[in-house]
Amino acid sequence: MDDELADLRRKKLEELQRRQLESQLYAAQQEQMQQELEAKKQAILRAILTPEARERLSSIRMTRPEFVAQIEAQLIMLAQSGRIRSAITDEQLKAILKQAQPKKRDIKIRRI
C-alpha cells in the first residue's frame, strides 16, 4: 500500500516536472520567434526609412507605442508590396503621421 502510494506520488511529480519543462520550452520558443520577428521588422524599417525618420518614430514611440506600431505595420506592408520605391524621409514621414492621426474635435465653450 505504501509502495503504491509512493509510486503514485513519484509518477505525479514526474508528470508535473515534465509539464513544467514543456511550458518553459514553449515559452522560450515563443520568445525566440518574437525576437526574430522584431529583428526582421527592424531590418525592413532600416531599409525604408532615413535615419532622421527612424529617430522621429522612436521618439514618438515613447509617448504613443500603439500608434507607432500601427504606422510601422503599414510601412512594412507597403514595402513588402513594392509600393515604396525609395527611403522615406523625415518630411514624408511627418506627412504620413499627420494623415494617420485621428481628427481632433474642436470643442468650444461659449458663455451665455
UniProtKB/Swiss-Prot annotation:
Recorded superkingdom: Archaea
A cellular-component GO term for this protein: cytosol
Database matches in Pfam families: dsDNA_bind
Listed name of the protein: DNA-binding protein Mthe_1571
Family, per entry: Belongs to the PDCD5 family.
Keyword field: DNA-binding
GO molecular function: DNA binding
Organism: Methanothrix thermoacetophila (strain DSM 6194 / JCM 14653 / NBRC 101360 / PT) (Methanosaeta thermophila)
